[in-house]
Amino acid sequence: NTLNGNNYGVILNGIEAYGNLVTGNTINDSNYGIRIYNDAHDNNLFSNTIQDSANFDIQLGESEDTISFNNTFSTISVDSNANMWVKVYLDLTVYDNSSNAFSNADIEVKENSSVLYSTDYFGGSDDRTDVNGTIETFMVAISHYNGSSEPDDVTTNVSVRFVDWIISGTYNVSNSLSFSVPDFRVQNQNNGNMFYSIGGAISASSPSNG
């Protein structure tokens, strides 16, 4: 849809305005491109272009947990009792050092302290990486307008583990993350077990290993 020259391009008003998906619109020359207020909540703005608004491209009054994905806008007003999450789809891939897909790796993804994805090693029930070295794609927040027209950054914490090798870090996600599991192996000569780190081999050794 293309909406031109309106007072409001899109308006979501009241507590019954929830769970809506506003997507694929071009909104030009409005006073307010999109306005959400008066206890509207849990609405989704996907792939809209809002431009040349007289006041604000997006105006959030009293409203909770609006989600923004792939929207183009330049001006926003967020009241003290409103918030909006800006999100992207996270594509996570695990490789070996030869750039081959690495399957069966454990993954944990946290948004700040909230767990979004967790395999059994990390206490969850989500799937490990598949034959393509990937997990299912899902949304993570990259910024949060929380009672302010200036967003706060949201960090994504990711841990990847295979056998005794593990890496954990904090990332500012754009849309994809990739991790490389080292190719080298360390063998415990006493029992023949292979390890992905020297530390793992040492930890599993006994005094009789010499």
Could you tell me what each predicted segment is?
Residues 1, 20, 25, 43, ...:
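Consensus "Asn ladder" position of solenoid repeat domains
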Residues 8-16, 32-39, 52-62, 74-84, ...:
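Glycine-rich beta-solenoid repeat tracts in large extracellular/virion proteins
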Residues 11-13, 21-26, 35-37, 44-46, ...:
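Extracellular beta-strand solenoid repeats
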Residues 83, 167-185:
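Extracellular beta-sheet/turn segments enriched in Thr/Pro/Gly and aliphatic residues
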Residues 90-96:
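A short, amphipathic beta-strand motif
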Residues 98-121:
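Short, ordered, surface-exposed loop/turn motifs in non-cytosolic proteins
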Residues 99-100, 122, 134, 184-210:
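Acidic Gly/Asp/Thr-rich repetitive segments characteristic of extracellular carbohydrate-active
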